Amino acid sequence: MKPQWQQYINIIKQVVKPALGCTEPIAAAYAAAVARALLGVEPDSIAVQVSDNLYKNSMGVFVPGTGKIGLAIAAAAGAIAGNPDAGLEVLAVITPEQVAKAQALIDAGKVTVERTETAEFIYCCVIAKKGDREALVKICGGHTLIAEKRLNGESVFSVDSTQAKATGSICEGVDITIESIYRFAQEVPFEEIKFILEASELNGKLSDEGMANPYGLEVGRTMKSGIAAGIIGEDLLNKIVMLTAAASDARMGGANLPAMSNLGSGNQGIAATIPVVLTAQCYKVSEEQLARALIMSHLGAIYIKSHYPPLSAFCGNTVTSAAASMAMVYLAGGSFEQSCFAIQNVISDSSGMVCDGAKASCAMKVSTSSSAAVRSFLMALSSHNVSGQGIIATDVEKTIKNIGKMILNGMSSTDVTIIDIMSA
C-alpha cells in the first residue's frame, strides 16, 4: 500500500464515526458527562460557555432521548445520564426519569448557558459543581477534543496548542488531492476500506425512521405523498431527495438513532452516504464498488472542508454533495475528468447556501444539495461542466481553494450577522 493511503484511512476513521444527535449540543452533553465523571457525583449546578458558532447550531435542534431543544437540556442530560466513554453517542441510553431529573435542574435555575468570545469555532466549557467541589471540562477544535480538565481548580489534564489539532486541519501536512483520493478509492485493497459500509447501514436506518415516523418538517414523507398522488415520479432524483431528507428529518427531530457523521456533521454524513448508496443500487454495482464510492465521497468531503473552518456561515452540505456527485460519476462508469466536472457543477449550483443554525429545515438544505448532486453527475456524464465562471476555476483544486478563500475572507461578517439575527 502507498504510504499516504494509511494516512487517508486514519483520517476517515478519525472523523467518519457514529454520532447520536446534532453534534453541537452533543458536544455540551459530552463535556458535561466527562465533568460529572471527574466530579464523582451528580452536580447540583452546571455552567456552560460556548462559542458563537456552537451556540448557533444548538438553538433549534432536538436532543435525542429528551424531546427537548437546546444546550441547557443537552448539558443537564449529559451530566445526569451521559456515558463519558461514548463520545458522540454520549446520550445513547437515557430514561424518562433521567430526562425529568435534568429538566428539574433547569427549572430550578441551576443550569446556565452563555456565549463567550473565542477564536475557536468549536468551543465548549462546562463547569459542574456539587457543594464546594467543582469540575471543569473544556472542549476545543473538535466536538470531542478535550483540551483541559480541572478538579477543584487543579489541572488534571491539558494539551498545548501544538497537540490540540482541530479537526478542520486534519489534512494539514498530508499529500492529498482530489485525484489522489480518486485513485486511492479505486485501488486500495477492499479489506482495508470495508468498514465504510457501516455508513450505509446507519444512515439507511435513519432514513427508514424518517420515512416511518413524523419528524421535523417531514420533508421526506411529503415527497412520498407527492409520489403516491402521482404529482412527482419515483425516479432516482426524487428517491435521493426523499430518502436523504428523511434521514435528516429524523436526525434533526431527535430520533434515538446514530448517524454516520462526516467531520463532525451528521447531516453531512447523510449527504455523503445516501445519494451514493441509491446510485449504487440504480446501477446494480457490487458491495466492493459501493465501498469504494463511499470512501471517495466521504474522504472527498473531508478534503474540501479542510480548506475552511469547521463551523461557519457556509452550509457544508454543498461541498459534501459535490464529493458525493464525484462518487456517483464513478459508479456510473464515468472518468476521473467527469468526476471533477461533477464537483465543479455542484459548487457552482449551491455554493450560496448559508448556515443559519442546526434545525428542522436543515433537511431542506440536505435535499437541495443532494438534488444538485444528481443533476451535476448527469451533466458530468455528458461532459457538461461549469468552468472559469464566477468562483469556479478551470481546475477543480483551484475551485476548492476559492471556496475556502470565500468563506475565510468573505463570510466572517455574514456569520456574525446571522448569529445576531438569531439571538435578537
UniProtKB/Swiss-Prot annotation:
A GO BP entry: L-cysteine catabolic process to pyruvate
Listed Pfam families: SDH_alpha
InterPro entries: Ser_deHydtase-like_asu (IPR005130), UPF0597 (IPR021144)
Gene Ontology molecular function terms on file: L-cysteine desulfhydrase activity
Family recorded in the similarity comment: Belongs to the UPF0597 family.
Protein name: UPF0597 protein Sbal_3070
Species, as recorded: Shewanella baltica (strain OS155 / ATCC BAA-1091)
Phylogenetic lineage: Bacteria, Pseudomonadati, Pseudomonadota, Gammaproteobacteria, Alteromonadales
